[in-house]
């Protein structure tokens, strides 16, 4: 299948995509976990009783990774194949997740692929992404042709989504601050319309995973057992369920309260960078960790309206899609090519 624009938000927590299917926007999401593929899957011998996991083998640099919604969130030794480092976009895991998103969508040719990076790493790594993923790619399932790659700051995707779907809440004449609480980083952009204020925008490695690690450490201290599968803590908090740990249901709310200092530290850094907020029409809160940070952000900016995006996980990807379509249309117009 050929598409004009394919938008991918390869986050530290989940990989999200958006692309056009007729007049609709198709979206998909799976965990940003890329374990080495298992060659002897027992479920294939289950005679229809055992369900096979929804994963694809994705080849990168001679290794095969399992990618998809059915990927295991925990492993026997606590390493599920998730990468939490600032140079994540340089890794084979990142390439495998990007390849998986293209394969699950059934895409074989893309005129423009739009990718995002955290605000504080975009200058460092955007050229690498353009060079690495423009041209003919192959992840073990045939060639995929990518004609061009555009890299944008991740929160810009949410700002564009807010402008498109926020109705009258988006004020083009005044400034908004977009806060994107991701899995590993929290990024914020102050923009007047679509003009970014670099001096007031920034990012910090203080996303949701740091909170989950704190909770894991507190549980380990109480239970006197190591706790390393923070993905299960993430899932339980999202679903508002207790964590099963050696037959015991552990309520995570008190542990979340004890981890509040980590959230407050990130929000304080944000306050220091942004400065006075009298000129802001609103703060737009997005990202998979938005719910964790919302109370602290309301407390830190009590006089500014807070808009929490619906389906915040997909906000960046949908915004990337709009950015890709707009830039492609402008370039075609400049060349005198029909859109």
Residue ranges and their predicted role:
Residues 1-176, 195-209, 222, 231-284, ...:
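Nucleotide/phosphate-binding catalytic cleft detector across ATP-hydrolyzing
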Residues 181-187:
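Ser/Thr-glycine-rich phosphate-binding loops at phosphate-binding pockets of nucleotides
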Residues 188-193:
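PRPP/pyrophosphate-binding module of the type I phosphoribosyltransferase fold
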Residues 213-224:
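Long, charge-rich alpha-helical interaction segments
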